[in-house]
Amino acid sequence: MTSVSTQLSLVLMSLLLVLPVVEAVEAGDAIALLLGVVLSITGICACLGVYARKRNGQM
């Protein structure tokens, strides 16, 4: 099983390779997309952490 950082870097690299092909996407759109992906992953990890702590009775 690959690590999370490896998977995340693979996703970001694939996005960076695909985005320049699309003509309608400008630099600002690409930055907004990458920022949204990073914030979404961070939010999901935070929710999973809260769930795990509640399940173990630490909260």
Swiss-Prot record:
Please list the residue ranges that the record places on the Cytoplasmic side of the membrane: 51-59
Q: Which Pfam families match?
A: DUF4730
* Topology with respect to the bilayer: Single-pass type I membrane protein
What is the primary gene name for this protein? SMIM30
Subunit comment: Interacts (via transmembrane domain) with antiviral protein MAVS (via transmembrane domain); the interaction disrupts MAVS interaction with RIGI and inhibits MAVS aggregation, resulting in the repression of type I interferon signaling and innate immune responses.
Single Gene Ontology BP annotation: innate immune response
Q: Which PANTHER family match?
A: SMALL INTEGRAL MEMBRANE PROTEIN 30
Induction description: Down-regulated following vesicular stomatitis virus (VSV) infection which releases SMIM30-mediated inhibition of the interaction between RIGI and MAVS and leads to the activation of type I interferon signaling and innate immune responses.
Give the species.
Answer: Homo sapiens (Human)
Role of this protein: Negatively regulates antiviral innate immune responses. Disrupts the interaction of antiviral protein MAVS with innate immune receptor RIGI and inhibits MAVS aggregation, resulting in the repression of type I interferon signaling and innate immune responses.
Its recorded name reads Small integral membrane protein 30
This protein's GO cellular component annotations are: endoplasmic reticulum membrane; mitochondrial membrane
The intrachain disulfides are none
Q: Which residues lie on this side of the membrane: Extracellular?
A: 25-29
Q: Which residues cross the membrane?
A: 30-50
Known InterPro entries for this protein? DUF4730
Q: What is its main location?
A: endoplasmic reticulum
* Signal sequence bounds: 1-24
**Entry keyword DNA repair:** no
